[in-house]
Amino acid sequence: MQLPLIISLYLCLFLTAPVCVSAQAAPSAPGNETTEQLSAYEHLDQFIDVLTLIQKNYVEQPAMDELMSGAIKGMLSELDPHSAYMPPKMFEEMQIETMGEFNGLGVEITIKDHLITVISPIADTPADRAGIRAGDIIIEIDGTLTKDMSIMDAINQMRGPRGSEITLGIMRHGETAPRTFTLTRETIRVDSIRQRLFEPAIGYVRVSQFQQRTAREFKDALKALHEEADTPLQGLLIDLRNNPGGLLDQAVQVCDLFLSSGKIVSTEGRRKTDNFTYNATAADTQPGYPIVVLINEGSASASEIVAGALQDHKRAVILGTGSFGKGSVQSIIPLTDHSGLRLTTAYYYTPNGTSIQARGIVPDVSVEQAVWKKTTPHELTKEKDLNNHLEPPSPQSPPKQDMAGEDKIESDFQLLRALDLLRGWQQMKHLQPCPVDGGHAAS
């Protein structure tokens, strides 16, 4: 490819990419360039000088398309961990991924201190089943060190044909030696919503990611829980643990199911078109049953929007550990060659005006995911174990049995605490206040 054509393409990309973000941004008339545009022209002169020197003097004939791709990647990598350039194939895969299907390992990553760091594994994927955790640092991918590797290059290396193997070197916090994980790539079909019912009429909805159909599937899950309970729900658990985020509009729609008015989230950027406030509507608002939202350090982005909105409106109790702290909004910008940019264009704020960027959502009830061992029956002594104990008088109502399968959650300490909180609330609201004798006072 000739150098003038390369320069022409670069100028087109460099000067028109911001227009792709919003059709409202019009180019300045000739002679009316802004200070920012004039500064860009000056830097382009330097870029063209370097590109010319490479083409004329490099020891081998340079691949100009690779140079251009590398230059664009370099620009984006200087911004923040979430801005990136996506070549055509990767851009196409990204669009498919929002539908909930792709070939890979099922792990959401970011860059922290120039290291590829796990935000969270997606439930029931190769990464999750292998035991990869939020906060793990991926130091090697198939023997290639990842230090200073771009996030998109790391994703590209971890993607691959279904059934192919990949080896990851993982450094875990608190450990001195790396771990090695060999995983087999799968077609990851992410079911963003799972639900179940606990006694007494307490619904549980797990949201693994916010995809294009998540809000609709969430609403369907609530309907299914109502039908299964055959009575109004007495409480709801929303599990956002290890949810790396996803689509902003889906998070807003999920919040709108539980809020009838007021602000859900606002975004603020450098341009007026990036400033927007999303408000709740009265349509289809769920009844006012109590809600507990579960979060942890793997809860990021869109999941933090949901937790923050319900917390600020005092519509839910947030339980677990502090969230990831990703409080920025990325715009997906398609380019003319079918590649694309993922560019950070705004910060988002919870209804109270709080930015959670690098801070995260602080839970109302802090509960670590402790390792909890169920006590076996022979380790406890109860009345029925005593010699000559009295039998209960007849007739006797059979004890309430929780739904089948609840024993599967016994190792999930945070979920158990959340259930206890909702069940306790149901019990406490039926208590009668103790009459107070106005003639006496405690001292």
Residue positions per predicted region:
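Positively charged n-region of N-terminal signal peptides that target proteins for export
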Residues: 1-7, 443
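Cleft-lining beta-strand/loop regions that shape enzyme active-site pockets
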Residues: 26, 31-43, 47-64, 96, ...
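Glycine-biased strand-turn-strand hairpin within the trypsin-fold
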Residues: 26-45, 49-57, 63, 78-106, ...
